Regions:
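Acidic, proline/glycine-enriched N-terminal capping motif
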Residues: 1-63, 67-70
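Short amphipathic beta-strand starts and helix->beta connectors
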Residues: 1-8, 51-63, 93-96, 119-127, ...
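Acidic, low-complexity central loop/insert segments
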Residues: 11-13, 20, 65-176
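Short glycine-/aliphatic-rich beta-strand segments at the starts of folded cytosolic domains
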Residues: 13-34, 101-115, 218-229
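Residue-level signal for inorganic ion chemistry
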Residues: 25, 75, 112-114, 139, ...
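Short, intrinsically disordered, mixed-charge
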Residues: 33-41, 83, 87-95, 155, ...
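Anionic-ligand-binding alpha/beta catalytic cores of soluble enzymes and soluble regulatory domains
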Residues: 140-227
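Glycine-rich, small/acidic residue-mixed loop/short-helix segments
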Residues: 185, 191-197, 204-207, 211-305
Length: 305
């Protein structure tokens, strides 16, 4: 299936390129709970959680999904984190009985969107997960059986390739590493508060900053939807300018695509406080190698409810 996806339920994506880490040892629960923004005790073998890892200033170092097996936890994250996620965890292992192992080559992951769990006898785990801000299922299978599982899923579901998955991600307002999520972003700014942050779980790296932001109720910028009112394509990296004078920079675009379901050119971007209310009109300034300006309107996320 191409990016022109019209029906979402019963659609599946291949996440096998994700980095996958196994965290084991007697201190694994206590250790991970001190590293992530979510409560690791809520992860199970039939349901996963989403969590962020932060630095001491509350800025993102990773975003991951986590499931709990009887003797270890499994984390998976965008492939762009392959070189940094394991070292980020190991940096904080002092006298803990904890090991972190890269098991990316051992497992393949598929995600099926829909409320009904798939019948997957060859799967090691079928885990409830909200990858696209809606009910779905992660299917973990031995990497040797990846092609077999792909065939089984394709027999009854629609495959969403990488282009299709990117459009769906943008339509649903889901941030991705190296696009919306970087080492300069605080998770609340990227709308990850509801899905990733537990304010009652106890201490973790970066907690003080997150707690202060919650108490103040303010964030300097916010991840927003943007719609081209001229039906002209938008481009990641475009600057957003306040109208009508265009003398104030209001933010920047991080991801963009054409949405066939909306018949519109849409984008995700960070918009500064004072300019991020839905309906606000802004100008997207062309990248240095392009010419022209595009009128855009701030929109609620997700684009499609």
């Amino acid at each position: 299936m191409t990016e022109e996806l019209h029906s979402i339920d019963g659609t599946f994506v291949d996440l096998s390129a994700h980095i996958k880490l196994r965290v084991a040892g007697n201190d694994r629960l206590r250790f991970l709970n001190g590293q992530i923004t979510a409560d690791i005790r809520k992860a199970g073998a039939s349901n996963s959680i989403q969590a962020c890892l932060l630095d001491a200033k509350g800025r993102l170092t990773a975003h991951a999904s986590i499931l709990a097996a009887p003797d270890y936890f499994l984390l998976d994250a965008d492939p762009e984190l392959k070189e940094t996620l394991q070292s980020r965890l190991e940096r904080y292992i002092i006298a803990d009985d904890v090991s972190v192992e890269d098991v990316s080559k051992l497992w393949s992951i598929f995600h099926l969107i829909g409320k009904t769990a798939p019948a997957s006898p060859d799967a090691r785990w079928v885990v409830s997960a909200r990858r696209f801000a809606r009910p779905g299922w992660d299917i973990w299978v031995d990497a040797l059986h990846r092609e077999k599982m792909l065939e089984q899923l394709s027999a009854g579901s629609s495959f969403c390739d990488s282009n299709c998955a990117e459009v769906l991600r943008i339509e649903e307002g889901i941030p991705r590493w190296e696009r919306e999520l970087t080492n300069e972003i605080i998770p609340i700014e990227a709308n990850l508060e509801e899905s990733c942050i537990d304010y009652d779980k106890g201490c973790y790296v970066g907690q003080e900053v997150i707690s202060r932001m919650k108490m103040s109720g303010q964030r300097n910028k916010k991840l927003c939807g943007l719609i081209s009112t001229e039906h002209t394509s938008l481009t990641p990296g475009m600057r957003l300018l306040a109208t009508p004078a265009k003398d104030k920079e209001a933010g920047w675009i991080t991801s963009a695509c054409h949405s066939a379901r909306l018949s519109k050119e849409i984008a995700l971007g960070f918009v500064k406080r004072g300019f991020n209310s839905p309906g606000t009109k802004l100008v997207a300034a062309a990248s240095p190698d392009q010419a022209g300006e595009i009128q855009v309107e701030v929109a609620d996320l997700p684009f499609i409810h």
